[in-house]
């Protein structure tokens, strides 16, 4: 009978696993690193939530209710109670959390697992802690929120999906607000009854309603103004836009650059390096493009920045501190100057990452005395990766200084460039002749001029054979130019002839019309004379008839 019950439980688990695989079919190709460090468990969250959070190991209560054994085999066979500890800074390590728990008298810690971003391996600001007794869990929930870890009061909650989703949503909102926030804002986000994570920091916000006393930080300050006041012994929040690294003592600035004022941050610990720098407009989780901006030399492990109030990012002069204040450098591209106050970069030569940090997102340690740059980028003389101005390949502007500075060419290179010049010359001449025969003299002249300039700019332009090519091109050019000018004069002459012929025709026409007009008037006058003569004759005839009648 017991075997039957076991078979039923096993089939129930298989069904759940198949359902989970059907639901999360698009997440089969997940990084192997996440599969190794995270215990697998079934949860009913949406697929988009699974992209941002690690899987939740089953608690003791879930094991009793489902009657199924956990997928991960633990070495500890006794009782196990899981808790969430949140509101931690992103640089809080498992050693820090272990020391804080041991200071409360809790020594039965079974597991500490930090929740991290899969994009860059950075901590989300909360962890899963497993203890071996109810008394230890109650002690943690009662006493740990009263302690401070790096200026933050931890929040302890039971381990269930509700609190996990709240932590994840809060971390996600912080990530989006940190990426979309403006550059150079001074002061933390506005205060209220419900505190949020400060922009730019991962997992630093307070859990809503977990610890009484309202918000930890005061209201926002306008950009360019002085920072808001903070209580004694409490560090101000970090500036927005990207998770900044803990800076060390500033070194000498590079030539022509001005270092920004030092920022307050966490002490640099040897067991947890800072995450990579996030520049504005860069896709989240991709390595920085081009060389990294030069930063201060790395501090000695175990020593952090000296105490004292940090200078403001912009606005009035900073208060006196251990280091003399420096004015911030001019605003510009993030790759041309040292890291501005809102983009502090990680110090080079950082120690290897802690066990819960993905080592694939951090570069290997380099020389601790020199600023690092991306191995794929050009040397830091030109931050935009432009080549030296004198290197222009086979073709460049003519000049004696450049010819003397060039290294001598080998025979193979010389022949290759010479063959190229011959091909350019022959093709240009043939095309120019065809264009000129078609009457397109402008295109022919332009083709020859371009070919001459290309051959003159080559590395072998001083050779006699190259000069012969240039002279042949110039002769062809002069011939086409003279032909184009001659055709123009012939056209002018023909036009003049046409004009003269038209003038003669017009003159002839005018003279003919005048003659015709005169002839017409002559004819008219003759007709008038004839009519007059006829009238006279009639009058005479009438007079004669009258005289005859009177007789």
Curated annotation (Swiss-Prot):
**Name by which UniProt lists this protein:** Cleavage and polyadenylation specificity factor subunit 6
Q: Name one Pfam family in it.
A: RRM_1
Write out the ranges of the annotated region (Sufficient for nuclear targeting): 510-551
Q: Which GO terms describe its cellular component?
A: cytoplasm; interchromatin granule; mRNA cleavage factor complex; nuclear speck; nucleoplasm; nucleus; paraspeckles; perichromatin fibrils
Instruction: Please state which protein family the record places this protein in.
Output: Belongs to the RRM CPSF6/7 family.
Function of the molecule: Component of the cleavage factor Im (CFIm) complex that functions as an activator of the pre-mRNA 3'-end cleavage and polyadenylation processing required for the maturation of pre-mRNA into functional mRNAs. CFIm contributes to the recruitment of multiprotein complexes on specific sequences on the pre-mRNA 3'-end, so called cleavage and polyadenylation signals (pA signals). Most pre-mRNAs contain multiple pA signals, resulting in alternative cleavage and polyadenylation (APA) producing mRNAs with variable 3'-end formation.
UniProt lists compositionally biased (Basic and acidic residues) regions at 389-404, 489-503, 515-551
- The annotated region (Necessary for interaction with NUDT21/CPSF5) lies at 81-161
Q: Where is this motif: GAR?
A: 202-206
> Region Disordered: which residues?
169-411, 477-551
Q: Where is the composition biased (Pro residues)?
A: 220-265, 285-366, 377-388
Renumbered residue ranges of the record's region Sufficient for nuclear speckle localization: 404-551
Where Phosphoserine occurs, the residues are 494, 500, 511, 513, 525
Entry's Gene3D superfamilies? 3.30.70.330
Q: Which UniProt keywords apply?
A: Cytoplasm, Methylation, mRNA processing, Nucleus, Phosphoprotein, RNA-binding
Show the ranges annotated as biased composition (Polar residues).
169-180
Whose protein is this, by species?
A: Mus musculus
This protein's assembly is summarised as: Component of the cleavage factor Im (CFIm) complex which is a heterotetramer composed of two subunits of NUDT21/CPSF5 and two subunits of CPSF6 or CPSF7 or a heterodimer of CPSF6 and CPSF7. The cleavage factor Im (CFIm) complex associates with the CPSF and CSTF complexes to promote the assembly of the core mRNA 3'-processing machinery. Associates with the exon junction complex (EJC). Associates with the 80S ribosome particle. Interacts (via the RRM domain) with NUDT21/CPSF5; this interaction is direct and enhances binding to RNA.
Q: How is it modified after translation?
A: Phosphorylated. Phosphorylated in the Arg/Ser-rich domain by SRPK1, in vitro.
Q: Name one GO biological process term.
A: protein heterotetramerization
Q: Where is this region: Necessary for nuclear paraspeckles localization?
A: 81-161
Q: Where is this region: Necessary for RNA-binding?
A: 405-551
For the modification Phosphothreonine, the affected residues are: 157, 404, 407
Instruction: Assign the protein's first listed, main location to one coarse class.
Output: nucleus
Domain of life of the native organism:
Eukaryota
GO MF term list: exon-exon junction complex binding; mRNA binding; ribosomal large subunit binding
């Amino acid at each position: 009978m017991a075997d039957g019950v076991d078979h039923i439980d096993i089939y129930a688990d298989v069904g759940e696993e198949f359902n989970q695989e059907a639901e999360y079919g698009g997440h089969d190709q997940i990084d192997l690193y996440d599969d190794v460090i995270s215990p697998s468990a079934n949860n009913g969250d949406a697929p988009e939530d699974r992209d941002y959070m690690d899987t939740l190991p089953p608690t003791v209560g879930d094991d009793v209710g489902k009657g199924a054994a956990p997928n991960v085999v633990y070495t500890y066979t006794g009782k196990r109670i899981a808790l969430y500890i949140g509101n931690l800074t992103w640089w809080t390590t498992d050693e820090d959390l272990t020391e804080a728990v041991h200071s409360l008298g809790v020594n039965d810690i079974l597991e500490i697992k930090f929740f991290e971003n899969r994009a860059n391996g950075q901590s989300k600001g909360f962890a899963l802690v497993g203890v071996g007794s109810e008394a230890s869990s109650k002690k943690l929930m009662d006493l740990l929120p009263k302690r401070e870890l790096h200026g933050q009061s931890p929040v302890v909650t039971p381990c269930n999906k509700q609190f996990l989703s709240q932590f994840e949503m809060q971390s996600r909102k912080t990530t989006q607000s940190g990426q979309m926030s403006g550059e150079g804002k001074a002061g933390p986000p506005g205060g209220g009854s419900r505190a949020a994570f400060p922009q730019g920091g991962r997992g630093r916000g307070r859990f809503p309603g977990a610890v009484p006393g309202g918000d930890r930080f005061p209201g926002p300050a306008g950009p360019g103004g002085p920072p808001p006041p903070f209580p004694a012994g409490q560090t101000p929040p970090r500036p927005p836009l990207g998770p900044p690294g803990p800076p060390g003592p500033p070194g000498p600035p590079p030539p022509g650059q001005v270092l920004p004022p030092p920022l307050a941050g966490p002490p640099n610990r040897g067991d947890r390096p800072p995450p990579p720098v996030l520049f504005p407009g860069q896709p989240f989780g991709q390595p920085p493009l081009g060389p990294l901006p030069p930063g201060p030399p790395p501090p000695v492990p175990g020593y952090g920045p000296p105490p004292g109030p940090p200078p403001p990012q912009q606005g009035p002069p900073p208060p006196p501190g251990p280091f003399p204040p420096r004015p911030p450098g001019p605003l510009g591209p993030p790759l041309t100057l040292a890291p501005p106050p809102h983009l502090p970069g990680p110090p080079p030569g950082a120690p290897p990452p802690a066990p819960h940090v993905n080592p694939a997102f951090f570069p290997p340690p380099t020389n601790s005395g020199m600023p690092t740059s991306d191995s794929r980028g050009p040397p830091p003389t030109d931050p935009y990766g432009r080549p030296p101005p004198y290197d222009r390949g086979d073709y460049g502007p003519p000049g004696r200084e450049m010819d003397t500075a060039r290294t001598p060419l080998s025979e193979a290179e010389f022949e290759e460039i010479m063959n190229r010049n011959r091909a350019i010359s022959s093709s240009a001449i043939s095309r120019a002749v065809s264009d000129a025969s078609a009457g397109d003299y402008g295109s022919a002249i332009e083709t020859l001029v371009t070919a001459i300039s290309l051959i003159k700019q080559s590395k072998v332009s001083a050779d006699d054979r190259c000069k012969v090519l240039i002279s042949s091109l110039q002769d062809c050019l002069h011939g086409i130019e003279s032909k184009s000018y001659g055709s123009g004069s012939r056209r002018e002459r023909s036009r003049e002839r046409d004009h003269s012929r038209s003038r003669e025709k017009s003159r002839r026409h005018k003279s003919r019309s005048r003659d015709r007009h005169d002839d017409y008037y002559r004819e008219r006058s003759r007709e008038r004379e004839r009519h007059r003569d006829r009238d006279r004759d009639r009058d005479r005839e009438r007079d004669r008839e009258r005289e005859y009648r009177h007789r």
